[in-house]
A protein has these predicted regions:
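Bacterial Sec-dependent N-terminal signal peptides
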Residues: 1-24, 438-444, 458, 485, ...
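N-terminal cap/lid segment of alpha/beta-hydrolase-fold proteins
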Residues: 21-68
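Gly/Ser-rich "nucleophile elbow"/oxyanion-hole loop immediately N-terminal to the catalytic nucleophile
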Residues: 68, 131-145, 149-178, 193-198
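Short beta-strand element of the alpha/beta-hydrolase
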Residues: 69-79
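Cap/lid segment of the alpha/beta-hydrolase catalytic domain
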Residues: 80-96, 111-141, 397
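The feature captures the conserved acid-bearing segment of alpha/beta-hydrolase catalytic domains
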Residues: 206-312, 321
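C-terminal catalytic histidine-bearing segment of alpha/beta-hydrolase fold enzymes
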Residues: 305-439
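C-terminal outer-membrane/trafficking sorting elements
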Residues: 447-529
Length: 529
């Protein structure tokens, strides 16, 4: 028993100091990729005939890393809610060069990264404005549903499946690229039904909302309807920080500063033709037609700053924030946006503007995704295979030129440079939002009597009950085995009583770390048969 007590004390000290590492800023690990993991199943309308579709995620992990409570980043790709090639673009999949590069950069720093696919399909070529707007909103709605299902899949894997990916479900980041940015933003703030039934989201002919929950399911895809299957509904869809690269938000009123909302940071190009920098029309590359008036990254981040959602980001260590002086300069720079002629300040806190000149080689060339790149020879092979298999007539040269139209000097070096700048913005803010220990965070380790903790039974067979004083609601419970591995976690509890099921835990001794707002208690629990 004395040896067990010493082990308990040593392990407790390890758990308390593990988050003090600053490893999430520098590349340290080789990266392992596990492809085509199914995180859920839902109804797709892509072919015109509703049918169940497997939703997949590629998971990138730091090889040789012993930690089991790592932060999770979920990356959503671009693509205009249509498959690559069909969208008139080269990109639009979780295997895009940009997606893979960001995933590898994050995993090499100690993050676990999931690059996920969401349901696609809408009517971009319809001559009917209502059809274009309505089906695009429905596509974005499905994408937000799938994003939330993906979050819940990973939380379930910790609570029920023994934490196979070694993550802490209370440290989740959404990272959206282009179209994926709509999901990273929307998944953070679309929490009320009234937000998707604003007048701009009403069919002007039928006077009915474009979004019908009796068909599409609720905001979280936790209800079953003709076009929605629930996935992992017992778990929270909450996450802690949203990073956006060139996406937009359906309406700025969706941001309302609720406690449930994450922090927000992002980048955007001033001459983006397809998504507004500040606010303006959304134009889809497939047809270059207007779809909806939306709020761009610059205004989204400013709104989040003003509402208090980003207050915690005021504590970002200036020694880590290498873009701080540049951001401060943009905050005092008055600019006229080249496409909308809006006269605004170029910058705001937690945002970086890529102010790319709209004139390139004497011609007007708006650029919105300079972080993208592709290989023409590889594209030709892919197009040949797709045409042979599906009877299509895509032309690789045409697709290549479509891409160059808004990225004329496209190259891997250029793309990586823009990604590197985005990482410099994101990483110090992820450190704070995810409480990664890149800097000190005020939380006190206390005795169980301080928070009035009662737990039992000990030993337990199927579940353990945790209770605290009214003024100390439980935020999360993390369970570690005696080797220090995180084997179970329950987050977003926010209650004074919680019954934790055993699920797949083997008989033996464990340490339960219970966290309230500013207190931490570690207690031993035992399961037997």
């Amino acid at each position: 028993m004395k040896k067990l007590y010493i082990l308990f004390c040593l392990l407790t000290m390890v758990l308390l100091t593990a988050d003090a590492q600053r490893r999430y800023l520098d590349q340290m690990f080789p990266v392992v990729r596990t492809a085509d993991v199914v995180y859920g199943k839902n109804i797709s309308i892509l072919t015109g005939m509703p049918a169940a579709e497997d939703l997949k995620v590629d998971i990138y992990t730091p090889a040789g890393d012993a930690k089991t409570d790592r932060p999770l980043v979920l990356i959503s790709h671009t693509g205009s809610f249509l498959p690559p090639l069909y969208n008139g673009q080269v990109t639009g999949a979780r295997t895009d060069s940009t997606v893979i590069n960001i995933a590898a950069a994050l995993a090499s720093r100690g993050f676990v990264v999931g690059c996920y696919t969401y349901r696609l399909g809408w009517l971009p070529t319809s001559p009917d404005q209502n059809a274009r707007t309505g089906t695009l909103l429905q596509a974005a709605y499905r994408g937000i549903q799938d994003t939330r299902s993906c979050i819940r899949y990973f939380k379930k894997s910790v609570a029920e499946d023994g934490n196979p990916y070694g993550i802490d479900p209370s440290k989740v980041c959404l990272w959206g690229i282009g179209t994926g940015g709509y999901l990273a933003l929307g998944s953070g703030c679309v929490n009320d039904w009234s937000e998707v039934t604003l007048p701009k989201f009403i069919n002007t002919q039928t006077l009915l909302p474009f979004i019908d929950s009796t068909l599409l399911g609720n905001l979280y895809a936790t209800t079953q309807t003709p076009l929605c299957l629930p996935n992992h509904p017992a778990y929270s869809s909450n996450f802690q920080i949203s990073i956006n690269m060139g996406g937009a938000l359906g309406d700025s009123s969706w941001l309302d500063g609720e406690a449930i909302e994450p922090t927000y940071a992002g980048v955007h190009c001033t001459s983006d033709f397809f998504a507004p920098f500040y606010e303006g029309p959304v134009i889809v590359p497939t047809t270059n037609q207007f779809v909806i008036y939306a709020t761009g990254t610059r205004k989204c981040i400013e709104t989040a700053n003003n509402l208090g959602s980003n207050d915690i980001l005021k504590t970002v260590d200036p020694n880590l924030d290498v873009l701080k002086n540049l951001i401060d300069g943009q905050k005092s720079t008055q600019t006229i946006l080249p496409l909308t002629q809006q006269n605004i300040l170029l910058g705001t806190d937690n945002f970086y503007a890529f102010d790319i000149p709209i004139i390139y080689n004497g011609k007007v060339v708006p650029q919105g995704s300079p972080w993208e790149w592709w290989d023409l020879n590889t594209l030709k092979v892919i197009v040949q295979i797709v045409n042979a298999q599906r009877g299509t007539n895509f032309n690789a040269d045409t697709l290549h030129l479509n891409g160059l139209a808004t990225n004329p000097d496209m190259s891997a070096n250029k793309g990586r440079a823009y990604i590197d700048t985005t990482l410099r913005l994101a990483l110090p803010r992820m450190c704070v939002s995810l409480n990664l220990g890149c800097q000190a965070v005020a939380i006190e380790e206390v005795d169980d009597a301080v928070i009035g903790l009662n737990l039992g039974p000990i030993p337990a067979k199927s579940e353990v009950r945790f209770e605290t004083k009214a003024e100390y609601p439980i935020e999360s419970i993390h369970v570690y085995d005696l080797n220090g591995n995180l084997v179970k976690a329950h987050t977003d509890i926010n209650a004074n009583r919680y019954v934790m099921p055993r699920h797949s835990l083997q008989p033996g001794f464990y340490l339960a770390q219970l966290k309230t707002k500013d207190k931490l208690v570690t207690k031993q629990i035992i399961f037997n048969d």
